[in-house]
Amino acid sequence: MDWIEEAKKIGFSGAAVMDTSKLVFVPEYRRFCEENLCGCYHVNPACPPQSGTVEEMDRRARSYEKTLVLQTIRDGSTDPRKDKLQQNKMTEQLAEKMKAAGMGDLLIMSAGPYKHHSCMSAYCVNAQKMADAAGMICWNDDDKMRFF
Protein backbone atom coordinates (compact mmCIF):
# COMPACT_ATOMS: atom_id res chain seq x y z
CA MET A 1 0.00 0.00 0.00
CA ASP A 2 1.17 3.54 -0.70
CA TRP A 3 1.27 5.00 2.82
CA ILE A 4 1.96 8.52 1.58
CA GLU A 5 -1.24 8.53 -0.47
CA GLU A 6 -3.14 6.84 2.35
CA ALA A 7 -1.96 9.55 4.76
CA LYS A 8 -3.21 12.25 2.42
CA LYS A 9 -6.58 10.50 2.09
CA ILE A 10 -6.90 10.52 5.87
CA GLY A 11 -6.30 14.28 5.91
CA PHE A 12 -2.58 14.93 6.28
CA SER A 13 -1.29 17.90 4.31
CA GLY A 14 1.91 16.08 3.46
CA ALA A 15 3.76 12.83 3.98
CA ALA A 16 7.17 11.50 3.05
CA VAL A 17 9.41 8.53 3.78
CA MET A 18 12.98 9.21 4.82
CA ASP A 19 15.92 7.24 6.16
CA THR A 20 15.83 7.32 9.95
CA SER A 21 19.60 7.83 9.90
CA LYS A 22 18.91 11.37 8.62
CA LEU A 23 17.01 12.34 11.78
CA VAL A 24 19.00 14.78 13.89
CA PHE A 25 18.73 14.36 17.64
CA VAL A 26 19.66 17.34 19.82
CA PRO A 27 20.06 16.27 23.47
CA GLU A 28 19.80 19.90 24.60
CA TYR A 29 16.14 19.88 23.50
CA ARG A 30 15.33 17.83 26.61
CA ARG A 31 15.29 21.12 28.53
CA PHE A 32 12.03 21.99 26.72
CA CYS A 33 10.45 19.02 28.48
CA GLU A 34 12.08 19.94 31.77
CA GLU A 35 10.56 23.44 31.53
CA ASN A 36 7.23 21.58 31.70
CA LEU A 37 5.21 24.06 29.66
CA CYS A 38 2.81 21.27 28.67
CA GLY A 39 2.43 20.07 32.27
CA CYS A 40 3.33 16.47 31.44
CA TYR A 41 6.94 16.28 32.65
CA HIS A 42 7.27 13.72 35.43
CA VAL A 43 3.50 13.09 35.18
CA ASN A 44 2.79 11.30 31.88
CA PRO A 45 4.69 7.99 31.43
CA ALA A 46 5.17 8.90 27.74
CA CYS A 47 7.14 11.96 28.86
CA PRO A 48 10.53 12.37 30.48
CA PRO A 49 11.91 11.20 32.69
CA GLN A 50 9.73 8.03 32.65
CA SER A 51 9.95 7.76 28.84
CA GLY A 52 13.69 7.19 29.01
CA THR A 53 16.93 9.09 28.79
CA VAL A 54 17.82 11.04 25.67
CA GLU A 55 20.22 8.25 24.72
CA GLU A 56 17.60 5.52 25.22
CA MET A 57 15.05 7.35 23.11
CA ASP A 58 17.64 8.04 20.41
CA ARG A 59 18.47 4.30 20.25
CA ARG A 60 14.78 3.38 20.19
CA ALA A 61 14.11 5.67 17.23
CA ARG A 62 17.25 4.62 15.34
CA SER A 63 16.25 0.97 15.58
CA TYR A 64 13.92 1.69 12.65
CA GLU A 65 15.36 1.91 9.13
CA LYS A 66 12.69 4.23 7.70
CA THR A 67 10.62 7.10 9.06
CA LEU A 68 7.22 8.10 7.72
CA VAL A 69 6.96 11.85 8.29
CA LEU A 70 3.38 13.12 8.56
CA GLN A 71 2.54 16.82 8.38
CA THR A 72 -0.58 18.83 9.03
CA ILE A 73 -0.73 22.48 7.99
CA ARG A 74 -3.34 24.70 9.61
CA ASP A 75 -4.33 28.33 9.43
CA GLY A 76 -2.65 30.30 12.22
CA SER A 77 -6.02 31.34 13.64
CA THR A 78 -6.98 27.83 14.75
CA ASP A 79 -6.46 26.37 18.24
CA PRO A 80 -3.07 24.61 18.23
CA ARG A 81 -4.14 22.17 20.97
CA LYS A 82 -7.07 21.00 18.86
CA ASP A 83 -4.86 20.84 15.79
CA LYS A 84 -2.30 18.67 17.60
CA LEU A 85 -5.07 16.40 18.84
CA GLN A 86 -6.41 16.06 15.29
CA GLN A 87 -2.88 15.29 14.01
CA ASN A 88 -2.53 12.59 16.66
CA LYS A 89 -5.93 11.06 15.91
CA MET A 90 -5.10 10.89 12.20
CA THR A 91 -1.71 9.35 13.03
CA GLU A 92 -3.46 6.75 15.16
CA GLN A 93 -5.90 6.02 12.33
CA LEU A 94 -3.06 5.53 9.84
CA ALA A 95 -1.14 3.36 12.33
CA GLU A 96 -4.18 1.09 12.69
CA LYS A 97 -4.29 0.67 8.90
CA MET A 98 -0.58 -0.11 8.86
CA LYS A 99 -1.00 -2.71 11.61
CA ALA A 100 -3.92 -4.27 9.74
CA ALA A 101 -1.61 -4.56 6.72
CA GLY A 102 0.91 -6.50 8.81
CA MET A 103 3.22 -3.73 10.00
CA GLY A 104 3.03 -4.43 13.71
CA ASP A 105 6.22 -2.82 14.97
CA LEU A 106 5.58 0.93 14.81
CA LEU A 107 7.08 3.80 16.78
CA ILE A 108 4.89 6.89 16.85
CA MET A 109 6.29 10.30 17.75
CA SER A 110 3.22 12.37 18.41
CA ALA A 111 2.47 16.08 18.18
CA GLY A 112 2.68 16.63 21.91
CA PRO A 113 2.28 13.69 24.29
CA TYR A 114 -0.65 11.54 23.25
CA LYS A 115 -1.80 8.41 25.06
CA HIS A 116 1.34 6.28 25.42
CA HIS A 117 3.26 7.99 22.59
CA SER A 118 6.11 10.38 23.31
CA CYS A 119 6.33 13.62 21.37
CA MET A 120 9.17 14.80 19.15
CA SER A 121 10.42 17.06 21.95
CA ALA A 122 10.83 14.07 24.25
CA TYR A 123 12.81 12.35 21.49
CA CYS A 124 14.84 15.56 20.98
CA VAL A 125 14.30 15.51 17.21
CA ASN A 126 15.22 18.63 15.26
CA ALA A 127 11.96 19.22 13.36
CA GLN A 128 13.51 21.68 10.89
CA LYS A 129 16.20 19.22 9.80
CA MET A 130 13.66 16.41 9.62
CA ALA A 131 11.43 18.56 7.41
CA ASP A 132 14.41 19.45 5.21
CA ALA A 133 15.35 15.76 4.82
CA ALA A 134 11.72 14.92 3.98
CA GLY A 135 11.38 17.78 1.48
CA MET A 136 8.85 19.64 3.61
CA ILE A 137 8.60 23.13 5.06
CA CYS A 138 8.76 23.43 8.83
CA TRP A 139 8.96 27.18 9.43
CA ASN A 140 7.92 29.80 6.90
CA ASP A 141 7.05 33.47 6.88
CA ASP A 142 3.30 32.95 6.57
CA ASP A 143 0.28 32.55 8.83
CA LYS A 144 0.40 28.73 8.80
CA MET A 145 1.13 26.37 11.65
CA ARG A 146 2.83 23.11 10.77
CA PHE A 147 2.64 19.98 12.90
CA PHE A 148 4.62 16.77 12.52
Indicate residue ranges for each PLM-predicted region.
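Auxiliary alpha/beta "docking" domains used to position bulky ligands
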Residues: 1-148
